[in-house]
Design a protein with these regions (language model features):
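N-terminal Rossmann-like NAD(P)+-binding domain of SDR-like oxidoreductases, especially those catalyzing
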Residues: 1-187, 317, 325, 331-332
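C-terminal substrate-binding subdomain of Rossmann-fold SDR/epimerase-dehydratase oxidoreductases
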Residues: 24, 65, 205-332
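Short, surface-exposed alpha-helical segments at coil->helix boundaries
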Residues: 44, 48-51, 165, 199, ...
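Conserved strand-to-helix beginnings and helix N-cap segments that scaffold or border functional pockets
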Residues: 44-45, 74, 98, 194-195, ...
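Residue-level recognition of oxygen-bearing side chains
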Residues: 72, 103, 110, 149, ...
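A glycine/serine/threonine-rich, flexible loop-to-helix segment
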Residues: 142-143, 194-202
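Hydrophobic alpha-helix immediately C-terminal to the catalytic Tyr-X-X-X-Lys motif of short-chain
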Residues: 163, 167, 171, 201, ...
């Protein structure tokens, strides 16, 4: 378990997943530093509210810094002197990455290199990297297993996350930095970004506005409750990667392993909200994949990972949360 004396630095700590991981760390007594640049990819007001929520759980130190700003990043890490680094900061989003490929490469690849270099220089004991199910691309081999070696991402975002994984492996190989990569599958829950499907669909259905659907609605996603993801991250913090060929590096899927079609998701939301969705049908978008489906056998066996919240229950919880914060949503 994370002890009170263990120093943990979490990048992207003001974000959706990061703020939940921060709360989990504080509940376990970690000495926590949160690093975030509070950028405007979506309203910084959301991120500040996330930080306030974390502060209600426990005390932490906040470091406003950009992982692309090497001098500021060095200053932040030298101040924190972490034993463990959890790297969740990233430029997110499949569709925007196709429009801004250089920015995604700069942040998700260059920023990760900057952080790994600082971890090497400061002799950090463990590096946990938040990756994505998107690295699997449009594979027909299901469920998606960590054993799959031919990964063909179909978006710039996915390619940058896979590049991040490869950099993690390289640093583990060259410098014996114990590293764990966690591939997150379609995470949802309170504080979800406003542009993500469940948040966006809920807001539009509640308001009686058209819900844009890309494709025929048959695309399936392995929706995973955010606290289940946070529990998986905690298990990774506790775990020492088993060296393969002398390299202390491992990859784990964190998902629910129960993919649901888009049409089924909308039907669930309609029942929970009590309103019918007004659908606006569009052609499929570049970068989207037909299915995500996590094989979580390895995470269950090695990390003790056990997703606990089924989709119906998670959506009910999400809608309750949304209704409590809807006026802040409108203001943002």
């Amino acid at each position: 378990m994370t002890s009170k004396s263990q120093r943990v630095l979490l990048t992207g700590g003001a974000g959706f997943i990061g703020s939940h991981v921060a709360e989990a760390l504080l509940r376990r007594g970690a000495h926590l530093w949160l690093l975030d640049n509070l950028d405007d990819f979506y309203s910084p007001a959301w991120k500040k509210a996330n930080l306030e929520a974390v502060g209600r759980v426990g005390n932490y130190e906040f470091l406003q810094a950009d992982i692309c700003d090497k001098p500021r990043l060095r200053e932040a890490l030298e101040r924190a002197r972490p034993q463990v680094v959890i790297h969740l900061a990233a430029r997110a989003g499949v569709r925007p990455s196709i429009e801004q490929p250089s920015l995604y490469e700069q942040v998700n690849v260059g920023g990760t290199v900057n952080l790994l270099e600082m971890c090497r220089k400061l002799a950090v004991r463990k590096f946990v990297f938040g990756s994505s199910s998107s690295v699997y691309g449009a594979t027909s081999r299901v469920p998606f297993s960590e054993e799959q070696v031919e990964l063909r991402p179909v978006s710039v975002y996915a390619a940058t996350k896979l590049a991040g994984e490869m950099l993690c492996y390289t640093y583990a190989h060259l410098f014996a930095l114990p590293t764990i990569c966690l591939r997150f599958f379609t995470v949802y829950g309170p504080r979800q970004r406003p542009d993500l499907a469940i948040h966006k669909f809920t807001a539009l259905i509640e308001a009686g506005k058209p819900v844009p659907i890309f494709g025929d609605g048959s695309a399936g996603r392995d929706y995973t409750w955010v606290d289940d993801i946070a529990a998986g991250v905690m298990a990774a913090v506790d775990y020492e990667p088993r060296p393969v060929d002398g390299v202390p590096f491992e990859v784990f899927n964190l998902g629910n392993s129960r993919p649901v079609k888009l049409t089924e998701l909308l039907e669930l939301l309609e029942r929970i909200i009590g309103k019918k969705a007004v659908l606006e049908r569009n052609l499929p978008q570049p970068g989207d994949v037909p299915l995500t489906w996590a094989d979580i056998t390895k995470a269950c066996r090695v990390l003790g990972y056990r997703p606990a919240v089924p989709l119906q229950e998670g959506l009910e919880r999400f809608v309750r949360w949304y209704r409590m914060v809807r006026f802040r949503v409108a203001a943002a």
